């Protein structure tokens, strides 16, 4: 079904709004994936706080203009499935990576984070906020209090020598 100009403008505005507030973006090709599998992917995306939409390439290019995801414009060839992570930068990449393991026809084209194209695998392995805090606490716990005090004292001594 052909879209009229108002529908196209609405789609561009909706995707642009999602892109403006997103932490990261992922573009994928979903040719050959069954409708049932795509429905389950959309459900998982909603649960993970990921905005996901199939958009025509020309509309996708216009939608990302003026956002940090302009770097993805070259990847809009063939059928494009756009996903924007709203809650965690790696959410969309992790979701697509897991989905691609189960569906061989699903292909991740590109991912972007902070205005640059990045590897989707790297983006997918970013720790969540809770995981990062747990890692930090584990590192702090491993260092004994004495080592920490000596390290802080050494830094203080270096700063005092630099001032003198």
Curated annotation (Swiss-Prot):
GO terms of biological process kind: translation
Entry keyword annotation includes rRNA-binding: yes
Pfam family, one: Ribosomal_L10
MF annotations from Gene Ontology: large ribosomal subunit rRNA binding; structural constituent of ribosome
GO cellular component: large ribosomal subunit
Keywords from the UniProt entry: Ribonucleoprotein, Ribosomal protein, RNA-binding, rRNA-binding
InterPro entries in the record: Ribosomal_uL10, Ribosomal_uL10-like_sf, Ribosomal_uL10_bac, Ribosomal_uL10_bac_type, Ribosomal_uL10_CS_bac
Gene3D superfamilies, per the entry: 3.30.70.1730, 6.10.250.2350
Role summary: Forms part of the ribosomal stalk, playing a central role in the interaction of the ribosome with GTP-bound translation factors.
Family label: Belongs to the universal ribosomal protein uL10 family.
Quaternary structure note: Part of the ribosomal stalk of the 50S ribosomal subunit. The N-terminus interacts with L11 and the large rRNA to form the base of the stalk. The C-terminus forms an elongated spine to which L12 dimers bind in a sequential fashion forming a multimeric L10(L12)X complex.
Protein name: Large ribosomal subunit protein uL10
């Amino acid at each position: 079904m052909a879209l009229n100009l108002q529908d196209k403008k609405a789609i561009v505005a909706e995707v642009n709004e999602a892109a403006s507030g997103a932490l990261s973006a992922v573009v994928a090709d979903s040719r050959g994936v069954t409708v049932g599998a795509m429905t389950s992917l959309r459900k998982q995306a909603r649960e993970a706080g990921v905005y996901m939409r199939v958009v025509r390439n020309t509309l996708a290019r216009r939608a990302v203009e003026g956002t940090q995801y302009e770097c993805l414009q070259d990847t809009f060839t063939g059928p494009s499935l756009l996903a924007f992570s709203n809650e965690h930068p790696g959410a969309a990449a992790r979701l697509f990576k897991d989905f691609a393991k189960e569906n061989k026809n699903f292909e991740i084209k590109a991912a972007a984070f902070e205005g640059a194209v990045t590897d989707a695998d790297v983006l997918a392995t970013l720790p969540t906020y809770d995981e990062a805090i747990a890692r930090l606490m584990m590192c702090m716990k491993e260092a004994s209090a004495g080592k920490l005090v000596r390290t802080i004292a050494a830094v203080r001594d270096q700063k005092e020598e630099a001032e003198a």
